[in-house]
Amino acid sequence: MASLSDSLVRQLLEGRYIASLATKNPDGSTHMVAVWYWFDGAHIYIATSTRTRKARNLQSNPKISLMIDSRDPAASCGVNIVGTAQILTGEPSRKWNGRVHAKYLSDAALADPRVGPVFASWDDVTIQIAPTSVIAWDMREADRQVFGSAFASNPTYLLPLER
């Protein structure tokens, strides 16, 4: 099992990737969505709206799963995080949501009245995740250990992903 301080985990948590967040629907099925996030070294923050299914699901069940991966076949790596979520409101929410938005949107987008203020008003709460389990994987390491570097020495073995 990995930890939040592992270099690969920190690279993924501090980088600009799209995460997949899973929550439980009232009927027990899984609700999974793509999200932007911010990592402060201990918690993960996701800007969202009280109107979203994920926020409503977390009101009754705070357990989450989060996956962040590189989406690069030649250097596939990722982290799976299980944790407990808390919904932040008010000033703490505005602070964290601002950091999430600034991580993914350019200064020009944030200043554009059609973009920045819309995100700020739509995302009225923040999901704060306290990780309880962290598991990381690195296909480059698996290639060296299991496949004798077959993929590294033959880049055409892995087909490109759709964009």
Task: For each feature predicted by the language model, list its residue ranges.
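Short, basic/aromatic recognition patches
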Residues: 1-20
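Charged, gly/pro-rich active-site loop segments
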Residues: 3-4, 77-163
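Alpha-helix boundary recognition
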Residues: 13-14, 59-60, 120
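Residues that act as N-cap/strand-start positions at coil-to-secondary-structure junctions
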Residues: 15, 31, 121-123
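A short beta-turn/loop motif at secondary-structure boundaries
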Residues: 27-29, 72-74, 117-121
